[in-house]
Amino acid sequence: MRVALCALALTSCPAAAAPFNSCGSGVCFSGNINHNAILQRAPERSAVYGSVNTASPAGAQVVVTLAGTAADGSAYSKDFPAAVNADSTYKALLDAMPAWGNFTITATCSACAGSPLSVSVVGVTFGDVYLSSGQSNMELALYNTFERNISLANVRSGKYANIRVLHGGYQGLPPNQDGNWILQPGPNVTNCSQTGLADGMWCSGLELAQHDDNSDGRSAFFNVRAVPWYFAEKLTDLFLSDGGVPPPPIGLVFNPVGGTMVEQWTPFEDQLSCASIACMCTSSGCNGSQPLNPNNQSACSRNGELWRGQQQPFVNMTLKGFLWYQQVQLDRRSPHPGA
């Protein structure tokens, strides 16, 4: 089952205000920057960001080093200093890099508190990165589609080796938390064939195809989200059909949550200007008839919860575009189903 989608091209987002610190060690990367990550290629400058121990002194500086082999085989190494902000976060913009290459990224903060004072991720390359969000239609796994076995056979034969996926997990945040502008660091594991599709790990299709899910014995590749994977397959095929142009690496970041409403994904403040948006139900009761206003954010805590928990960590990530798929939950309340 194929689904046709279009992706909206983006440039890198500006640094966000008041990020949330989630690194208790000396220095760390945000969890979306892990081993085997795909970062956005030129002409954009890809962002590398994270946080340091909150006890670090004022004026501390993180040096982000990108070193490795470029696509043309030449050696590359360059430092990118990044000031530590008052909230203990940092962000560096790398040079615009062409597709492919094999790099190590290191963040070092010799003046920071705690340990380690230097962390590295390996196997990083550059390509086109897409954020895939939405409701259960986007959450649907390959296992539930008709062409899953065709995709599995293609991956095992070495096709679509340019595609890597990152599973972002789930985190909804109440309004009394500003939200995560970075993610918890991912597992220090470099090959998904031993783990399957785990939160915070960049995985190739072949690695997942080599791992059986212990819960039911099927290939872990079938746990990949179907819509973005088929999108990346089709995009790869289009590159190859265009005079045999080698496809770039394609990075797919998954963070959909089934059974959700668009109000959960939208910043609370942005919903205040729309009179038709009401307060969503909470665990303590339903305030559905209550209009939103700046003073009832606690009572209407579900409005915006997924923006704070699911989307904010990727605001600073440089992207090629995004995929959004949501319908069923909205249909249940719409006078025009499917609209």
Model-derived features: where do they sit?
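Cell-envelope and extracellular/periplasmic
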Residues: 18-339
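Cleavable N-terminal signal peptides of Sec/SRP-targeted secreted and luminal proteins
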Residues: 1-16
